[in-house]
Amino acid sequence: RQRQMCIRDRQRTGEEHYLELLKDNYPLVRSIRRFSEMDYSHALRVSEISGECAGKLGLKENLCRAAGFYYRIGRMEGEPYTENGVLLAQNACFPEELIQILREYNGELMAISTKESAIVHMVDKVVTKLDLLDKETFSTTWNQDMVIYQTLNENSATGIYDESGLSMNQFLTIRDFLVKGDHLFDSNNRE
């Protein structure tokens, strides 16, 4: 019976189902928050920004929000992060298209294969980089803009998005949105 329920849940891919996975009272949301307030904060930012980026391209916003939130879930179990993240998602009966994005975490095991996966990867890389740098570094918006350009251009140059179907125009649209979206990377979010 549990297996049948899990199969049914994995087949649910409606945008409203993804919102259920992001509610404060959802067990894995609570687990991430208990695991690390820093990881929880990071997950919230990646989730929100990924959804905004998907909206700019007319893609699945709530899938990107859910994937952004759970992208680093494997950290709760330790290495190997990707495999552990996929196992947690499978045990929670996440929809297959969400599990696929988690399976493509950082392009480590599998190439990034969808536009939504590329967006989540791009946003996670930028948020991670901005988290690592101190507030002094961002005394001007120019510095923040340069970090975003450099991070995304370096990742793109590796070919990591080549199999995602993301066009150069779409990549540039997302990059420009991230650069111009000062409110998305409010320095008050970084500690």
Spans of model-derived segments:
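Membrane-interfacial segments at transmembrane helix termini in multi-pass membrane proteins
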Residues: 8-31
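Short, small-residue-biased leader/transition segments that mark boundaries at the very start
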Residues: 2-7
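Divalent metal-dependent catalytic cores for phosphoryl transfer on phosphate-bearing substrates
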Residues: 27-155
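Acidic-enriched, low-complexity/disordered segments with a strong bias for Aspartate over Glutamate
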Residues: 9, 24, 39, 124, ...
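Long, hydrophobic alpha-helical segments that serve as membrane-spanning/inserting helices
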Residues: 138-141, 146, 150-191
